[in-house]
Amino acid sequence: MPHGEKLYEGKAKILYATEDPTLVIQYFKDDATAFNAQKRGTIMDKGVCNNRISSALFTYLEGRGVRTHFVKQIDDRSMLVRRLTIVPLEVTIRNITAGGMAKLLGIEEGMVLKRPVFEWHYKSDALGDPLINDDHILTMDWATAEELAHIRSESFKVNDALKAFFNERQIDLVDFKLEFGRCPSRGTPPSAGSATGMPRPQAEAVSTTILLGDEISPDTMRLWEHGTRRKLDKDRFRRDLGSVEEAYQEVLRRVLGEAHQASGASR
């Protein structure tokens, strides 16, 4: 599918315009970053793995009532998605202690939590994606109370679905991050600036629908092999554990093993 001008290039993806102003092409790169881009590298075919994994998981979630920006997979590195105005927040859901939570609370990694922990983070590399709460968000007009309630509900729905999905594949879903965006309900596409993936300073007053955006991949999830706790995600890059490409390929193999059977065919 031919693409138009580059709208935005981030650390892991590029967004391109299409002939339809309501749709963009999301292209996955092999570039890898960690610690808010302080560490950089390349993971061979990471873009291919993440695009295919995300396509399968978005399709799976759509089949379970989660509305996403995903339209279809175009090729090995690209997917067609709805054009969103990204809410300047990242959601993190934690099922097992690891990473930032273990460091913040001074506890060991690997403790299974008695209930999932939900976190809001302000989407800002410069500030290190700080942990925030509802009051910060509402005071800064980053989202409305109704939007926050919807995002929270959808995030837990995603967690339930993905935990079941990966459990069947002998993988523990340790934690993951999600991003959401606004899709105009009246057929008017977002302005060019808002389609870049950069956050808006305020919530828009127009009628919109909140959709799950970005990607769902080993870049955005912590995945441990059940029983061994072997890391199958970007922590292998962050912590110089080696075998990074093999871990991504292993997740792809397990995801595609049954994803298409569960959802029919890839859209």
Features from the language model and the residues they span:
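Active-site loop/lid in soluble adenylation, ligation, and acyl-transfer enzymes
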Residues: 2-122, 255
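Short Gly/Ser/Thr- and charged-rich N-terminal loops/segments
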Residues: 189-204, 267
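Conserved metal-phosphate-binding beta-hairpin within the catalytic cores
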Residues: 93, 173-184, 208-214
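Short histidine-centered catalytic/ligand-binding loop motif
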Residues: 38-48, 131-154
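A short glycine-rich, hydrophobically flanked beta-strand micro-motif that places a catalytic Asp/Glu
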Residues: 72-77, 166-183
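C-terminal helix-cap and adjacent tail motif
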Residues: 216-260, 264-267
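A long amphipathic alpha-helix within ATP-dependent nucleotide-binding catalytic cores
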Residues: 142-174
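Phosphate-binding core of ATP-grasp and ATP-grasp-like enzymes
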Residues: 111-128, 159-172, 216-221
